[in-house]
């Protein structure tokens, strides 16, 4: 299995930007922790960060056929981007949305996610640990998909 982690605008500034909201952990530290968790589960993991909406859309589209699931922190674009929402819909695979801060305790414009309705789930407000939670969520989804495929194969064999 392979997972792509897509980071949106200003995530590269973690540990520097608004530490009272986002904490002191840098993006690279989050990625390192995720690499370790993925390695223990024998799952490949890749990372991508961009401050540009079109580059995020391109990366989401590139996931089709190359990864099994996506973790995305679209950051501010989660609240505004129909293009990112449409790209997530188009790839038809498990996508989990992450927000480091609890967006529901923040400004009103941050309280609605355009992408949440097309994601398998959202992890909001758990700080950097939210990425680990999202990864565990994808592992659970992968297990369910594999169990379903095994049951289908068994049913097909029984019908032959």
UniProtKB/Swiss-Prot annotation:
HAMAP family: AroQ. It comes from the Bacteria. It is an enzyme of class 4 (lyase). Belongs to the type-II 3-dehydroquinase family. The lineage of its organism: Bacteria, Pseudomonadati, Campylobacterota, Epsilonproteobacteria, Campylobacterales. Pathway: Metabolic intermediate biosynthesis; chorismate biosynthesis; chorismate from D-erythrose 4-phosphate and phosphoenolpyruvate: step 3/7. Gene3D superfamilies: Dehydroquinase, class II. This is 3-dehydroquinate dehydratase.
């Amino acid at each position: 299995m392979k997972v792509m982690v897509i980071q949106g605008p200003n995530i590269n500034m973690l540990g520097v930007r608004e530490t009272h909201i986002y904490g002191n952990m840098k993006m690279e530290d989050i990625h390192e922790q995720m690499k370790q968790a993925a390695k223990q589960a024998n799952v490949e993991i890749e990372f991508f960060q961009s401050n540009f909406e079109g580059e995020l859309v391109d990366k989401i589209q590139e996931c089709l056929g190359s990864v099994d699931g996506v973790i995305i922190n679209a950051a501010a674009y989660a609240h505004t981007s129909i293009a990112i929402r449409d790209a997530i819909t188009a790839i038809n695979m498990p996508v989990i949305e992450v927000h480091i801060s609890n967006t529901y305790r923040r400004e009103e414009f941050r309280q609605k996610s355009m992408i949440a309705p097309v994601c398998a789930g959202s992890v909001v407000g758990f700080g950097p640990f939210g990425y680990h939670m999202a990864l565990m969520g994808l592992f659970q989804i992968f297990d369910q998909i594999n169990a379903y495929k095994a049951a289908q194969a068994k049913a097909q064999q029984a019908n032959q």
